[in-house]
Amino acid sequence: MLVSYKWLKELVDVDVTTAELAEKMSTTGIEVEGVETPAEGLSKLVVGHIVSCEDVPDTHLHLCQVDTGDDELRQVVCGAPNVKTGINVIVAVPGARIADNYKIKKGKIRGMESLGMICSLQELGLSESIIPKEFSDGIQILPEGAIPGDSIFSYLDLDDEIIELSITPNRADALSMRGVAHEVAAIYGKKVHFEEKNLIEEAERAADKISVVIESDKVLSYSARIVKNVTVAPSPQWLQNKLMNAGIRPINNVVDVTNYVLLTYGQPMHAFDFDKFDGTTIVARNAENGEKLITLDGEERDLIADDLVIAVNDQPVALAGVMGGQSTEIGSSSKTVVLEAAVFNGTSIRKTSGRLNLRSESSSRFEKGINYDTVSEAMDFAAAMLQELAGGQVLSGQVTEGVLPTEPVEVSTTLGYVNTRLGTELTYTDIEEVFEKLGFAISGSEVKFTVLVPRRRWDIAIQADLVEEIARIYGYEKLPTTLPEAGATAGELTSMQRLRRRVRTVAEGAGLSEIITYALTTPEKAVQFSTQATNITELMWPMTVDRSALRQNVVSGMLDTIAYNVARKNSNLAVYEIGKVFEQTGNPKEDLPTEVETFTFALTGLVEEKDFQTKAKPVDFFYAKGIVEALFIKLKLDVTFVAQKGLASMHPGRTATILLDGKEIGFVGQVHPQTAKQYDIPETYVAEINLSTIESQMNQALIFEDITKYPSVSRDIALLLAESVSHHDIVSAIETSGVKRLTAIKLFDVYAGNNIAEGYKSMAYSLTFQNPNDNLTDEEVAKYMEKITKSLVEKVNAEIR
């Protein structure tokens, strides 16, 4: 919110420096971002009256004789398309400073002497977005009464001081000049004095011309007024100055009035051209899926049922609370204006403006709240201004649908409650003084008092809110310093926090270093290593194209980190990250993504470097898999690894899917050589594990089992198998043999070569058996081995050696 200090002083008698005011407002609850003076850095800019203006042949230039209050006319060469005889302009005389500290000097253009420069507002440093459209491509024309030689600062209010406020959602009442004036008045114990307009209505009734219908519960109130015989023209300079200093571009007197009322009251308004209506009934309703509307910015908007529209004859003419429609836009030929003042559901407006990426001054106020008490007053004020500035005739009455509560909100508390919370010894008289400054009525006594909170302060509803107001206005610096009183509370980690700690212990114990990568990446990298890619959630306004989409995997960002290090000769890396990925199964423009906690690590280079005793040991698949196994041993969870050949960007022969109770929870393996080449990194192994799924398993109750006092028995078995048979196949065959007393399977030897037929290999296992309730006999163990042997022969075609 940009607050003009000149304008503020019209509403409340305050005569302090802006620095002092900013400090005071910040300490009482409204943060001040800063104070700027538009004229800062500018000098020697005066009013000039163009006495004559001649075109320079074969150029776009004009040779002007300008009266700048000196004894002689000043010759200035100007190339602006709208320069002409008889107008008042901004002249930078030699020695003047304009935007970017540029100094104006005497010079020659096409051989013609130029004793200064006729300036546009852009050349004074004003933003393109706030310059009136009529002057956006040329010089600024000053009012007819401007006196040649006078400083231009007062004519354009460039000598004003602009206070930028950072308004939090709970203080949306300060999104208006009246709201800020109330706040400043309370701080300094002053009274506000707001301008009142004398509205003169015609005998003709507005209700005879139009009617209003509300067909959505998202519309709390809708009011309309008709002003006829208006003359659309540029606004007077004082109004344009106020709008520009508030960051709003002047358009014409009708539109500018609605924006002025928006700034004054915080009440969004809209003006329709009544003659462009194809009907007389204004309907506030939900849009229909697939309905379209071209808004004032010329963009065609695709609407959905959650959007609110204003319709006439079943055709949308405005996107309610956000932006008007082009079909009923006020133009230079408009004669009859329909003014709108409404209250729409803030949540609905926020969703619509967010979905369409269409933020406006109106939408921001509807999102944060509207003062119900001044909706009707703002409408009448706008109509009266159109009488003054556009010569309009106001038809009698507002056409209104919906009733708004306007009575004050009663909040009761006690003096004891206030003093206990603040640690003070305030009296009832002190409390009365505070609420008198705020403009709140108060009644009662020290035992109990009731405060009537006006509707302009919709953030106050409970006792604690009253305490906050008392503390703000009384002064935080006056509150006594006391030690906090609080009993000890037992803290506890969440299950996910505990899981993160255990994962971090294993990772760092394995020699991994923690890193944090960006959650935003490119759309391509967002899904590159995803096992089940979902819809991509993209930002509407990304800072860079490389950070435009929420990631669905952590691996791609981790590989960027590895590439960065490898490029700087740091080639032996072992890193991990515990972070979130974002899965989107719905519509990214409407639904929030699901956040999934993951554990990811990456390994590249050497595990052990070469020395005089040992060879260098590079990272391999089994080293990475071993870290995963160590993690699940720590977590006391049984997982299985299944060869995976179809995972994008991963090596088809060195990648495994990780299964927990048959459910896929991640993968481990080598990055595909082609992908590694794209990242410009050497052979790299990665793993990504879904911690959110593991968390649910961690919460299962553990069943205690007695430690058996009976010894275990081990038997070794050597198998001759085809090379295609995997360790997993063998373990599966053993486990499904139906032997209940089998407690452990350990592979201790693999051999292929001499004395083994080509295409075959030898694998030796140690099998452990144990009966928790009795000693195992040799006969029992022999039967178990027979079952296992039979299963191996039948299921993997093994030959017992």
UniProtKB/Swiss-Prot annotation:
Molecular function GO terms recorded: ATP binding; catalytic activity, acting on a protein; magnesium ion binding; phenylalanine-tRNA ligase activity; transferase activity; tRNA binding
**Superkingdom of this protein's organism:** Bacteria
Point out the gene that encodes the protein. pheT
Residues covered by the B5 domain: 406-481
- State the top-level EC class: ligase
Which UniProt keywords are given for this protein, alphabetically ordered? Aminoacyl-tRNA synthetase, ATP-binding, Cytoplasm, Ligase, Magnesium, Metal-binding, Nucleotide-binding, Protein biosynthesis, RNA-binding, tRNA-binding
Primary localization = cytoplasm
Q: Where is the signal peptide?
A: none
Lineage start: Bacteria, Bacillati, Bacillota, Bacilli, Lactobacillales
Listed name of the protein: Phenylalanine--tRNA ligase beta subunit
Q: Which GO terms describe its biological process?
A: phenylalanyl-tRNA aminoacylation
Documented EC number(s): 6.1.1.20
Q: Which InterPro entries match?
A: aa-tRNA-synth_II/BPL/LPL, B3/B4_tRNA-bd, DNA-bd_dom_put_sf, Fdx_antiC-bd, Fdx_antiC-bd_sf, NA-bd_OB-fold, Phe-tRNA-ligase_IIc_bsu, Phe-tRNA-ligase_IIc_bsu_bact
Specify which residues bind Mg(2+) according to the UniProt entry for this protein.
Answer: D459, D465, E468, E469
Identify which cofactors the protein needs according to its UniProt entry: Mg(2+)
Q: Which residues form the FDX-ACB domain?
A: 708-801
Q: Ranges for the tRNA-binding domain?
A: 39-153
Keyword Iron attached: no
Q: Which family does it belong to?
A: Belongs to the phenylalanyl-tRNA synthetase beta subunit family. Type 1 subfamily.
Query: What is the free-text note on the cofactor?
Result: Binds 2 magnesium ions per tetramer.
Q: How does it assemble?
A: Tetramer of two alpha and two beta subunits.
| Reactions it catalyzes | tRNA(Phe) + L-phenylalanine + ATP = L-phenylalanyl-tRNA(Phe) + AMP + diphosphate + H(+)
PANTHER family hit by this protein: PHENYLALANINE--TRNA LIGASE BETA SUBUNIT, PHENYLALANYL-TRNA SYNTHETASE BETA CHAIN AND LEUCINE-RICH REPEAT-CONTAINING PROTEIN 47
Covalent S-S links between cysteines: none
| Compartments where found | Cytoplasm
One cellular component term (GO) for this entry is:
phenylalanine-tRNA ligase complex
